[in-house]
Amino acid sequence: MKRIWMYLSAYKKECVFAPLFKMLEALFELFVPLVVSAIIDTGIGNADKGYIVKMSLLLVTLAVIGLTCAITAQYFAAKAAVGCATGMRHHLFKHIQSLSFTEMDTIGTSTLITRMTSDINQVQNGVNLVLRLFLRSPFIVFGAMIMAFTIDIKAALVFVVAIPVLAVIVFGIMLSTRPLYKKVQAGLDKILGITRENLTGVRVVRAFNKQENEIREFKQANEQLNHLQKFVGKISGLMNPLTYVVVNISIIALIWIGAVRVNAGTLTQGQVVALYNYMSQILIELIKLANLIINITKALACAGRIENVFSIKSSMQNGSTTESTDTRAAAVEFKNVSLRYSGAGDESLTDISFTVKKGQTIGVIGGTGSGKSSLVNLIPRFYDVTKGEIYIDGVNVKDYRIEALREKVGIVLQKAQLFKGTIRDNIRWGKKDATDTEIMEALDIAQGREFVEKKDGKLDSFVDQGGKNLSGGQRQRLTIARAVVRKPDILILDDSASALDYATDAALRKSIREMKDAPTLFIVSQRAASLMHADRIIVLDDGNVAGIGTHEELLENCEVYQEIYYSQFRKEKEA
């Protein structure tokens, strides 16, 4: 609630005017039964057509004024609700960007998408309804009861009995459904997660004929959500019929008492109609209030889930160093580094130590799950080490400002991720003010110039989201160009040439080595041929260093490297 008020504080005027105009509308509405009563008792009773016309015009005037107030209130409420949701969505997105990969992995992508979309939309709807109805409905209920007392005290006692009973029903159902709505939202998260995973891996699903398995898993989760929603719906569904029963019994009692008092000459027919209208107003407003409370319950549950994301703070503290002053320091140094991912049992990396000089090319090789990507992901500080220290240019990576550190490092990840826009726009992610000349130089290094120049739009050629309109090799070359255009001190190629043929891969490595002020290069690859000419090769095996050395040294004394190399060059082994 505090966070919602924080965002609404920028809309104080709207938060005052929205309920104010709604209460003005309610005030005019409370006079309608009195006007109708006057028409019946005076106009119809005395057959006074002029009076009837005059009072009918008054009814129309009250309706027009009420409508104007309602529209004005809706405008202010919508402005405040949309503004609140917009501010919350912006700050939530900004907060998500500040989280480290550890927190992102823990929360989950589908959960964050739900918080950003449906949860914030639910809060927006709740705020809108609260501003319009939270004061109006109680005002009508108690106002109608007071007006009833001004007409006849004994008949109005029916209201005194009915309203507390209705309040017990409404608030009892609200309290019982609130925790259930949290479970419903959790079920929706699960559905979204399954859907996202299926759509992301749809090609794999179909390649292995796993459609039926996916359908079965989705059906199970969907049915669980269905049963839960039905249960919540049954409880919430009791509200309207129970309130109708109480109100209808009250109306019957009111008409019976009214009839007795009309016969006694204490009440007029118009006054009985007015009492009936006030009871109807109470019924309508209590139903609105009941639905409002259900929506408030949903909104508060969603707001609590959003607050849970806001309460998660990044485990990665920002440093203050922007540049190293030690020109003699090693480019990269790992000292007894270990890494355990959050929630994982075993360490992904254990006691890793090595030193890399500036300008060296380092190969990283190992079996599947050996920790190759984990190792290079520590250099730009995507994750923090569990133990040990990492130094870049003699400065601990934790002491760098994260932005400054990542400016020094260019990384090409395993998955070639491009964004909707032109080729020029995508490469400028690496350097926002890169000229076309710099972009073409980067494409030359990445071996991508040829295919770009063949396109009609060249650098202005459009790239679909994710680069779906490009081949795997084209996507990889563009992501490499994006990394090298900034001319980083350290360049990491994390198995990012897997879609390239050997000739293109070799030309790429040659171009990088020939760059002016060539970067310190880390190449992660499954191909031994891609790493043979590296200054040193780090061989990983189940998170441990199995060997460090040149290709020739490792081929002599590292069994893990021998196994990898000879599995790819069998003829040489046989010879």
Q: Which residue ranges define each predicted feature?
A:
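An intracellular "coupling" helix at the cytosolic face of ABC transporter transmembrane type-1 domains
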Residues: 9-13, 98-102, 118-131, 135, ...
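Membrane-integrated ABC transporters
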Residues: 1-32, 36, 44-58, 73-77, ...
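Helix-loop-helix
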Residues: 48-54, 147-161, 231-305, 309-310
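Helix-loop junctions and hydrophobic alpha-helical segments within the transmembrane domains
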Residues: 8, 92, 96, 205, ...
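Transmembrane helices of ABC transporter permease
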Residues: 10, 14-27, 62, 129-184, ...
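ABC-type nucleotide-binding domain
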Residues: 325-575
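Pre-NBD coupling/linker segments of ABC/ABC-like ATPases
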Residues: 314-327
